Amino acid sequence: MAKSKFRPLHDRVVVRRVESESKTAGGIIIPDTAKEKPQEGEIIAVGSGARDESGKLVPLDVKAGDRILFGKWSGTEVKLNGEDLLIMKESDIMGIIG
C-alpha cells in the first residue's frame, strides 16, 4: 500500500528543482547534455524541526511553497510518485528567494 504523501523527518525538506532556461539571453539554445542541474527549487514538504541542546523543538525557517537556493552538491536525489525530487537538511539551503 503506497502512500501518496511523503513527510520528511526532523530538519529535512523535500525540494522540487526549478528548471533553468533552455535559451541564453542572446538566443542560443542550450542542449540538455550541456545544462547544469539547477540550484534553485521550491520546497514541497518540511519536517517538524530539529531539537536544541535542551531537547526543545526548534521549527524550521522555511515552509512549503518557498523558493530557495541550495549548493550544487546538496541533498539526496529521490524519485517519489514518478517525480525527481531532492531531500536535504535545512542547513544545506543558502537562502529564500523573494
From Swiss-Prot:
GO cellular component terms attached to this protein's record: cytoplasm
Domain of life: Bacteria
Sorted UniProt keywords: Chaperone, Cytoplasm
Biological processes, Gene Ontology terms: chaperone cofactor-dependent protein refolding
Gene3D superfamilies: GroES chaperonin (2.30.33.40)
Principal location class: cytoplasm
Molecular-function annotations in GO: ATP binding; metal ion binding; protein folding chaperone; protein-folding chaperone binding; unfolded protein binding
PROSITE patterns membership: CHAPERONINS_CPN10
Keyword Cytoplasm: yes
Entry's localization field: Cytoplasm
Similarity annotation: Belongs to the GroES chaperonin family.
Record's subunit section: Heptamer of 7 subunits arranged in a ring. Interacts with the chaperonin GroEL.
Its biological purpose: Together with the chaperonin GroEL, plays an essential role in assisting protein folding. The GroEL-GroES system forms a nano-cage that allows encapsulation of the non-native substrate proteins and provides a physical environment optimized to promote and accelerate protein folding. GroES binds to the apical surface of the GroEL ring, thereby capping the opening of the GroEL channel.
Protein name as catalogued: Co-chaperonin GroES 4
